[in-house]
Amino acid sequence: MKLNWETTLLILLVLEILLFGAINPRMLDINMLLFSTSDFICIGIVALPLTLVIISGGIDISLGSTIGLCAIALGVMMQFGLPMYLAVPLTLLLGLLCGLFNAALIHYTGISPLVITLGTLYLYGGGALLLSGLAGATGYEGIGGFPDSFTAFANLTVLGLPIPLVLFAVITFFFWLITHRGRFGRHLFLIGQNPRAARYAALSVNGMPYALYGLVGVASAIAALVMVSYFGSARSDLGRDLLMPALTAAVLGGANIYGGSGSVIGTALAALLVGYLQQGLQMVGIPNQVSSALSGALLVVVVMGRSLSLHREWVRNFFTKHTRSLR
């Protein structure tokens, strides 16, 4: 029986947990498994819309800086006495505007999304540092003093499940619905597979990036809100370490770096796989630097595997040719 990739990822996730559990039995504790997701679930929150961007043939590497900018902006608004019921929607709006700005630059300049979002990565990161400096929040302290009702949010539970995990499940369902069960998703895959054919089919090839990058921006703002609530402080560097794991989750989940294919469920499972990998390595005493290096190595291996699978015929001919030459 041939397993699909999502099933394979689920099996790998279970094996990963069992492996780390054999080394450290705490890894098998159900409460630890559930509540430790709050440490890394933001990887999945931003990886889901990033998957859609990759399916379309684009990329967004500015999401980490967008998270930092949204986080510090939330802190500044709180410092100026703005109530949280206004500051939270404004933070979401800021994330949306960052995403739309990326899309507008890509649309009107025609420059590669990689180059554009590399530029905005530094633009948003610089803006976050500027706001942080103006607010007097330098170093690792950030801006604290958030209302208890806000900081308690990330520690609430619904049916015994932590709120961040429930939020991730809801966001996953939303993206699965629009990507795999609607006209939006069909248009998305067609644009990623063949933009020229999509234009001939009268699809909104130029309009699609605004929706996709806007979703990444909003998801980045949501991640910022969750992280600020969880850590109790707003810092400009909150999203610094999320880009590589999020990109790894999207590609490991099945997103084709050349566009045209991908899976929301695959990305969700891959995000848990990457997150529990980080948690497991920390629990067995592996430094964070090694964990980051392994995430990068995993991304390289997955990209190489995807590239080889796309050029399967060339690889087969290459080995056939060299095998004959050795005889």
From Swiss-Prot:
Superkingdom of origin organism: Bacteria
Membrane-topology annotation of the record: Multi-pass membrane protein
Subcellular compartments: Cell inner membrane
GO molecular function, one term: transmembrane transporter activity
Chief place where the protein resides: membrane
Keyword set, alphabetical order: Cell inner membrane, Cell membrane, Membrane, Transmembrane, Transmembrane helix, Transport
GO cellular component entries: plasma membrane
Stretches that traverse the bilayer: 3-23, 41-61, 63-83, 86-106, 114-134, 158-178, 211-231, 257-277, 283-303
InterPro entries attached to this UniProt entry: ABC_transp_permease (IPR001851)
Subunit description: The complex is composed of two ATP-binding proteins (LsrA), two transmembrane proteins (LsrC and LsrD) and a solute-binding protein (LsrB).
Role: Part of the ABC transporter complex LsrABCD involved in autoinducer 2 (AI-2) import. Probably responsible for the translocation of the substrate across the membrane.
Family to which the UniProt record says this protein belongs: Belongs to the binding-protein-dependent transport system permease family. AraH/RbsC subfamily.
Name of this chain's protein: Autoinducer 2 import system permease protein LsrD
Organism the protein comes from: Enterobacter sp. (strain 638)
Gene name as annotated: lsrD
